[in-house]
């Protein structure tokens, strides 16, 4: 089924309101296995709406119109659709009764004749009751094309779609997705590595998305059940993870989890919790961002001991008890300083692990290190590890954010290998 969404309202075209209905409907239809091919916005104008309907009829077999069901003269969606289909308008008895109840306790002058328009339907339509408003929606099929009319206010449209429209459109098959998350590889490299799979994709489809510092692959398929979809996903996922990067690293090693709402921080937090480990941190360029991210999770106090924000060399020395001479000798942007910061944070908080971040957020260089140079340390009972990452060509904000992602990834890999 090819679906098309037509939003009716001049206020959308002038930018007075954002068309959130289109996003909601597209997501809802996708979950039902219905593909949305086109989205259109048209003003409150009969001739332009008629021309759009003519175009839509030739390319779509499900046309959903939103907005223009109110009582005023510029609310002309149902009237224009009726004209387009060569049909009359009729009154829905339940909608009329709802109008009667609504105006029963109001002065007589409140119910003007134009209010009756809200109870009208294109002849032959199945009414879609409006649980939160007065304008009734409708659905009808003409010459192989299904037309749906919905109110514009999201507070009215969403309940109508969820409670009335979805049961009528359910076809049995639904759209299922599985999101694979990767860290440590760019989108262009991942797409190049998987180019043959992506070029030849059919079912499931494979869609890459770049996010700040990481890449996701969305696998999508239509199936009658989650079990059927999972069987398809497993085969494709196994093939994806069998590929290697240009550095001969398996994609399975940089794959870290599933889901739209997952994150490296979430994975690291869950591992700390499941292993009963505590963690602390000492941060310089990230200024507490690692610790703040940890604290976002409910129950963080069970694994997060506390930490330090030591932005200057003097504070690194004073708060972490690192000799100032050592810091001056090695520099604040160094593997030595990152290692010492992690070791001292672990010692002072008596935590199982401690992370440190020091580097150059930019835009200027520091100690002959270019912007984006970051050293990350991780201290544990097994010893201290430091890594250097180069986050070039990014804003200060992105450098700090990506540095924190690297820190969580270091925690994740350490816990998995411990």
From Swiss-Prot:
- Domain of life per record: Bacteria
Q: Name one Pfam family in it.
A: CinA_KH
PANTHER family per the record?
NICOTINAMIDE-NUCLEOTIDE AMIDOHYDROLASE PNCC, NMN AMIDOHYDROLASE-LIKE PROTEIN YFAY
> What family is this?
Belongs to the CinA family.
Q: What is this protein called?
A: Putative competence-damage inducible protein
């Amino acid at each position: 089924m090819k679906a098309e969404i037509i939003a009716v309202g001049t206020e959308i075209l002038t930018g007075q309101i954002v068309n959130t209905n289109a996003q909601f409907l597209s997501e809802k239809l996708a979950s039902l296995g219905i593909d949305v091919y086109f989205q259109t916005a048209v003003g409150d104008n009969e001739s332009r709406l008629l021309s759009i309907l003519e175009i839509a009829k030739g390319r779509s077999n499900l046309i959903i119109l939103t907005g223009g069901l109110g009582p005023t003269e510029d609310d002309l969606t149902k009237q224009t659709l009726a004209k387009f289909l060569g049909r009359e308008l009729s009154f829905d008895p339940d909608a009329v009764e709802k109008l009667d109840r609504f105006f029963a306790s109001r002065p007589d002058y409140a119910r003007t004749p134009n209010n009756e328009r809200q109870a009208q339907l294109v002849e032959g339509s199945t009414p879609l009751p409006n649980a939160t408003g007065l304008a009734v929606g409708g659905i009808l099929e003409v010459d192989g094309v299904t037309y749906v009319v919905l109110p514009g206010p999201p507070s009215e449209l969403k309940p109508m779609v969820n409670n009335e429209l979805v049961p009528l459109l359910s076809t049995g098959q639904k759209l299922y997705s599985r999101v694979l998350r990767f860290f440590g590889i760019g989108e262009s490299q991942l797409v190049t590595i998987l180019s043959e799979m992506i070029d030849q994709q059919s079912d499931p489809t494979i869609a890459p998305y770049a996010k700040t510092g990481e890449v996701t692959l969305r696998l999508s398929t239509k199936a009658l059940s989650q079990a059927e979809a999972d069987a398809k996903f497993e085969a494709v996922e196994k093939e994806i993870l069998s590929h290697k990067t240009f550095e001969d690293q398996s994609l399975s090693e940089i794959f870290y989890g599933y889901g739209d709402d997952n994150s490296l921080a979430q994975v690291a937090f869950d591992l700390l919790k499941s292993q009963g480990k505590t963690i602390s941190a000492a941060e310089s360029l990230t200024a507490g961002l690692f610790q703040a991210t940890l604290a976002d999770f409910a129950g963080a106090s069970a694994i997060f001991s506390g930490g330090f924000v030591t932005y200057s060399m003097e504070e690194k020395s004073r708060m972490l008890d690192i000799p100032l001479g050592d810091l001056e000798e090695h520099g604040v942007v160094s593997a030595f300083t990152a290692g010492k910061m992690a070791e001292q944070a672990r010692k002072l908080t008596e935590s199982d692990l401690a992370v440190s971040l020091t580097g150059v957020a930019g835009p200027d260089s520091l100690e002959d290190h270019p912007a984006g140079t970051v050293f990350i340390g991780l201290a544990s009972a097994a010893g201290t590890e430091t890594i250097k990452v180069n986050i070039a060509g990014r804003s200060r904000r992105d450098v700090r954010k990506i540095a924190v992602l690297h820190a969580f990834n270091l925690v994740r890999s350490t816990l998995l290998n411990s």
